[in-house]
Amino acid sequence: EVGIPSQAKEAIAFAILASCTLDNEPGNVPSVTGASARAVLGSITPAPLQRAAAPRNALVPSAVPADRSSLLTEQRLPESMSLDSMPLNEALDLMSSQDQQAVAAVRSQHAEIATLIEIVADRLHRGGRLFYCGAGTSGRLGVLDAAECSPTFRTDPQMVQAIIAGGEGAVFAAIEGAEDDTQAGAAAIEIRNIGPSDVLIGIAAGGTTPFVIGALAAARNQKAATALICCVKPTASEPPVDVVIRPLTGPEVLTGSTRLKAGTATKLILNTISTLAMVRLGKVHENLMVDLRATNQKLWDRGARLVALLTGLQRESALELLRSADGSVKIAVLMQRGRLTSQEAQAALAKSGGALRVALELNAEKR
């Protein structure tokens, strides 16, 4: 630092942060800039979430907002018109009965969901990536599902990712106006180099979110496979995609609050897509998550129990075997049942495309 002007040091620091951001690697250089927050989606040093509220007129739209009153998700539910004065037990029964409609709505979309699962599994098998994209509740649901794939299925963190309008901070608090930025949605696709080998699933309960529409259009331009999950009937503004999953959950108990039935249906759909796509990638044996990543005590325990279940070993011996297999349930099972070394088990698993069932069958044929 000796002899370097402060302006030059500041310029260098901001160049580093900008580079990290463009590479989609949030960074922070507190020793140089004094920043306490990481760089997020183009913001060099984003403001802390505890900042004072913006002036009231800052949130007033510059243009007349589109009239969304015709959307199914914006309608009033007759059964909940007296929600504010309804006895608690009655309100509980009402919400529970309405939640059942979310399940039924998902069931009505099984054909479309199956089509999308096949597309996702094919692209992932060929080395592509799956992206969820949404704003608000829809974006957070994508984050939830993407975050669970690595520990559950031992996937590379890059394989399944989530894009949320407003960036990382929007996971924890509303970022006003972020969902209205179509260009930001398109930029999110460009910065991640999404292309023909990838899949983008847009999530928008009302089907009109500009950020999601911009992202889908950009992904489609790059020849990526695209899909939309929405809870309304077709509209003129609906973007063209390869697959539309349309669970019509109907009006919400709390009018317009799509974190309720629409959110429930969306979570069920994302659960189904990721789980069954991973089954097709050989990451499940029987109904067991044999590709789990043992990152904590709970998962080491579960892994040991899986090894014991599939080999007949006692828990202590299974845990020792799992450790020798570097935490891989598949390798541990192949070592025990196939009488293989760790290296031989890895080779057998690679030959079978990662499917434990196939690897066990091939090894049995050799003996």
What is each of the regions a protein language model found here?
Residues F131-I269, S274-L281:
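Glycine-rich phosphate-binding loops that contact phosphosugars or nucleotide phosphates
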Residues T272, A277-R367:
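Short, amphipathic alpha-helical interaction segments embedded in low-complexity terminal/linker regions
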Residues S6, R76, P251-S257, G282-Q297:
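Conserved Rossmann-fold dehydrogenase catalytic segment
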Residues V2-Q50:
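Glycine-rich phosphate-binding/hydrolytic loop that grips phosphoryl groups
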Residues S108-H125:
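A short, well-structured juxtamembrane/interface segment
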Residues L59-A105, Q109:
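Cofactor-/ligand-binding subdomain signature composed of acidic, glycine-rich
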Residues T73-E74, L94-A102, A162-A173, H285, ...:
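Gly-rich Lys/Arg/Thr-decorated short loops/hinges at beta-loop-alpha junctions or inter-strand turns
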Residues S31-L59, A294-K298, N363-K366:
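A short, charged, Gly/Pro-tolerant segment at domain boundaries
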